[in-house]
Structures are given as C-alpha cells and as structure tokens.
Swiss-Prot record:
<dbReference type="InterPro" id="IPR016161">
    <property type="entry name" value="Ald_DH/histidinol_DH"/>
</dbReference>
<keyword id="KW-0560">Oxidoreductase</keyword>
<dbReference type="InterPro" id="IPR029510">
    <property type="entry name" value="Ald_DH_CS_GLU"/>
</dbReference>
<keyword id="KW-0520">NAD</keyword>
<dbReference type="GO" id="GO:0019545">
    <property type="term" value="P:arginine catabolic process to succinate"/>
</dbReference>
<dbReference type="InterPro" id="IPR016162">
    <property type="entry name" value="Ald_DH_N"/>
</dbReference>
<dbReference type="InterPro" id="IPR016160">
    <property type="entry name" value="Ald_DH_CS_CYS"/>
</dbReference>
<keyword id="KW-0056">Arginine metabolism</keyword>
<dbReference type="InterPro" id="IPR016163">
    <property type="entry name" value="Ald_DH_C"/>
</dbReference>
<dbReference type="Pfam" id="PF00171">
    <property type="entry name" value="Aldedh"/>
</dbReference>
<dbReference type="InterPro" id="IPR017649">
    <property type="entry name" value="SuccinylGlu_semiald_DH_AstD"/>
</dbReference>
<feature type="active site">
    <location>
        <position position="277"/>
    </location>
</feature>
<dbReference type="InterPro" id="IPR015590">
    <property type="entry name" value="Aldehyde_DH_dom"/>
</dbReference>
<comment type="function">
    <text>Catalyzes the NAD-dependent reduction of succinylglutamate semialdehyde into succinylglutamate.</text>
</comment>
<comment type="pathway">
    <text>Amino-acid degradation; L-arginine degradation via AST pathway; L-glutamate and succinate from L-arginine: step 4/5.</text>
</comment>
<feature type="binding site">
    <location>
        <begin position="220"/>
        <end position="225"/>
    </location>
    <ligand>
        <name>NAD(+)</name>
    </ligand>
</feature>
<dbReference type="GO" id="GO:0004030">
    <property type="term" value="F:aldehyde dehydrogenase [NAD(P)+] activity"/>
</dbReference>
Length: 492
C-alpha cells in the first residue's frame, strides 16, 4: 500500500510503478499509481479536514511540525540512505539534504510570524488589524533532484499556515516521498491534513485538474510549469507558485587565485551531477592569457571528477544522474552542440552502459549562433569568451530564464553594475551559483517562475492577508459628513 489518503495507507488503482537504483539497477520500491478517482478522494479528504485544521491555534499546528523535525533528526541516517540510493547522489550530499529539511522548519516558524502573522495599529476611533488566513486545499508537486528538501519547502509553511495538502512526489522518487510521508504519519497529523498520491503524468494531470483545489505549489522543469500555468489560466481564485529551471550564467573576470575560481566553477556547474536548478549552464570567460590559463585548469580538474555510487568510500564528488535516460539526454545535447559548431574541451562519457554515471562535459560555443535557449539538466557546461564587461552582461541576460547569475571578480564596482543590470532572482559575487540561504528568497523571473519557495518567503504564498478596521463600541460621530441630518425635527 503506497498511497496515504485520509489517514490510511491504500493500494493505488493505477499502473504499476517500479523504482530502481539508477546506477546498480536494484529494485528499491514498487507500487501502483493513484488513479483519477483516488486523486479525487484525496482532495475530498483534504477539504473535509481543512476547517478543523485551520481553526487550530498556530501553536497546535507548530507542535506537529516540530515533532516531524524531531523524527527527521532521529531517522536521519535511514532517510539519507533512501534519498541517496534513489537519486544516485553520494551519501554526503543526501545527508546535507536531510539537514536542510530539519533546519528550515525553525526558520519557517519564525517566517510565519514575521511575514504573515498578525499586526495591529491603534487609530483614534478603533484599530486597524492585519491577519492572514490559509487558502484551503493545496496540491504540492515535488521534484526528483531534492525529493525531501524541496517539497518540504512548500509543505511545512503550508501546514503551518493552516492549509491541507495533496502531495505528489516526482514519479522518479516515489520511495523518498513514501519515507517522508511515514514520518509525517508518526508526527500525528490528523486524517486528511496531508495526503500522498504517487504517480506520473496521468496522476499529475488529474491532480492539477481538480476543481476544488485552492492552489498548486510546483517545483520542477519549465516545460511542466508552463503546462500548469496554461491549465490554471483564467482561475485567479487559485494561488499558483512556480519554481522552475534556469539557463544560468557565471561570469569570470580577472582572478588572482585561479584554483579558487575553478573550485567555485565546479561547485556551480557540476555539484549534484549538474542537477540543481541553479547550476551554471553558461560560463562567460574574459578573453586573454589569464582566461586561457583558467580554462585549461578548469578542464584539467574537471577531468579528474569520477562519478561513483552512493556508498563508495572514499565518497565521490558526484554520483549518478536520476536515470540512464537523463544521462543519455545530456550526451545527446552535447552532440547537438558539437554539430552546431561547438568545440569540445571535455567530452561527457557514460562510464558504463545501463547506469547513469556520467562524467562532466565542457564545450566552447564562442561565435556559434542560433543556439536553443534551453536548460540541459546535467553536468554540461558551455563556454563563451568576451572582450569587455558590458558585453558579458548582455550575453548573460540573453535568455528567457532568470534564476541565478554569478560573478567572480575582485571589483565591487562590477558587482554593483551586475546587480543593477542582471535579470535574475539570485545574483552572487565570488560565491557558487548553487549556494542559497534559507532566510533569503529562492527563485527567479521569466521562465524560471514567479513566487519564492524558500523557508522564509514561502510564507507569502501559503496564506492570504485579511485587513480589518475594528472598534469595540459603536457611537454616532460628533461631526457628520455634509448632507447627513440626524436631528429630531420631522421632515415634511
């Protein structure tokens, strides 16, 4: 039984789904998808549970959420292994994901009070109050690259605000979704408050098509995000929060420490096997001998990156991609870029047929035109050379996406210029593009999405503001507006 609906584990009535380790092929999880009828049941359960959950005090909801945080801590090793085995990422990185899940809970609690709590200001004849109310029933779509951490960034603030939820993990990470749901079960959530439906496209379409949804919170690809936006167009009564991908630029200016700059670039482009939405996809490198030296060093160090299994010792920097198909898509993208005129500096290689272990690739695209503006979700870095900083910014902004952007430079003035001109929601200076702070917004503009699903800013879209003018008594004003007559004289 792999679906959690209204406080019970039930068997899906849809197609059988089998999840394998993307490197070893070992079967990790299997179960049936939720069909449309079961998705509807989950929605009705969430709707029935909403009034009581929303009427609980914030403190009562907080108790359950903090209990979940404690369960994450006590089950950290087990959940780390599940995420690592299912995604292919090394154990060390999966452990940081679980830690991030834990840390964001305390931040989400604080964010609720600071950003969406209650405020009151006194007026001469009463008071003006601001309160926040939950939307109702929300659907949460989770991605596969961080199957615990990223859905957690929606679920925790949504529950704290008083919403009830239908959670659909990525069809590529059902085991992680299952494991997290069982911890929520132990945390003592009332039936119907959080429901789990497993499945792929058909389940997702049934979920997003529900008329009784009050909103949808999504993290994933731009293509799917666009489909959801079209599907919910003309429905302003539903909140839609989209965090999508990026075709992210990293600009390398003059650098004193080449190895430090290479390290930052590798962290930006190849961590998580290039499967972070903030990963650098486009590298802009200043022309000249220093740029040549940097590029040669980047290729040399990247060539030493050997993907390994989740439990290899010593631990590898990167593991496998989410699937062999995903790895092959990166190879195909590289081949297409080469055919368009790109100059390969480091060819990506599948280490073994039938696995998702893929080495990083680097290809120079200077002077090549007509390139597609698409995110290649994997360890493939494209390189352009530029002559001046204004040109670098123009090239960096030449994308429909706007998630992250970075600059490596000793000059604060250039960073200030980038801050003014960059089209990105995250702009870093001498820091990896993949770094983020839970107290800062996480998200972008354009094809990268709309709202900001971080622990701090997610509170904004999980509740709506209610303004009130209040007085504990009613009296006739001493001064009336023109034309009003409350005298005792009888008008004839």
């Amino acid at each position: 039984m792999t679906l959690w609906i209204n406080g019970d584990w039930v068997t899906g009535q849809g197609a059988l789904r089998v999840k394998r380790n993307p490197v070893s092929g070992e079967v990790l999880w299997q179960g049936n998808d939720a069909d449309a009828a079961q998705v509807g049941q989950a929605c009705r359960a969430a709707r029935a549970a909403f009034p009581r959950w929303a009427r609980l005090s914030f403190g009562d909801r907080q108790v359950r959420v903090e209990r979940f945080a404690g369960l994450l801590e006590s089950n950290k090793a087990e959940l780390t292994a599940i995420i690592a085995r299912e995604t292919g990422k090394p154990r060390w990185e999966a452990a940081t994901e679980v830690t991030a899940m834990i840390n964001k809970i305390a931040i989400s609690i604080k964010a609720y009070h600071v950003r969406t709590g209650e405020q009151r200001s006194e007026m001469p004849d009463g008071a003006a109050s601001l309160r926040h109310r939950p939307h109702g029933v929300l659907a949460v779509f989770g991605p596969y690259n961080f199957p615990g951490h990223l859905p957690n960034g929606h679920i925790v603030p949504a529950l704290l605000a008083g919403n009830t939820i239908i959670f659909k993990p990525s069809e590529l990470t059902p085991w992680s979704g299952d494991a997290v749901m069982r911890l929520w079960q132990q945390a003592g959530l009332p039936p119907g408050v959080l429901n789990l439906v497993q499945g792929g496209r058909e389940t997702g379409q049934a979920l997003s098509a529900l008329e009784d949804l009050d909103g949808l919170l999504f993290t994933g690809s731009a293509n799917t995000g666009y489909q959801l936006h079209r599907q919910l167009s003309g429905q302003p009564e539903k909140i839609l929060a989209l965090e999508m991908g990026g075709n992210n630029p990293l600009i390398i200016d003059e650098v004193a420490d080449i190895d430090a700059a290479v390290h930052l670039t590798i962290q930006s482009a190849f961590v998580t096997a290039g499967q972070r939405c903030t990963c650098a996809r486009r590298l802009f490198l200043k022309s000249g001998t220093q740029g040549d030296a940097f590029l040669a060093r980047l290729v040399a160090v990247s060539q030493r990156l050997t993907p390994g299994t989740w439990d290899d010792e010593p631990q590898p920097f990167i593991g496998g991609l989410i699937s062999e198909q995903a790895a092959q898509q990166v190879v195909t993208a590289w081949q297409e870029l080469e055919a368009m005129g790109g100059r390969t500096l480091l060819a990506p290689r599948l280490l073994q047929a039938g696995t998702s272990l893929l080495t990083p690739g680097i290809i120079e695209m200077t002077g090549v035109t007509g390139l597609p503006d698409e995110e290649v979700f994997g360890p493939l870095l494209r390189v352009w050379r530029y002559d001046n900083f204004d040109e670098a910014i123009r090239m960096a902004n030449n994308t429909r996406f706007g998630l992250s952007c970075g600059l490596v430079s000793p000059e604060r003035e250039k960073f200030d210029q980038l801050l003014l001109e960059a089209r990105a929601g995250i702009v870093n200076w001498n820091k990896p593009l993949t770094g983020a702070a839970s107290t800062a917004p996480f998200g972008g503009i354009g094809a990268s999405g709309n709202h900001r699903p971080s622990a701090w800013y997610a509170a904004d879209y999980c509740a709506w503001p209610m303004a009130s003018l209040e007085s504990d008594s009613l009296t006739l004003p001493a001064t009336l507006n023109p034309g009003l007559d409350f005298s005792d004289e009888v008008v004839r």
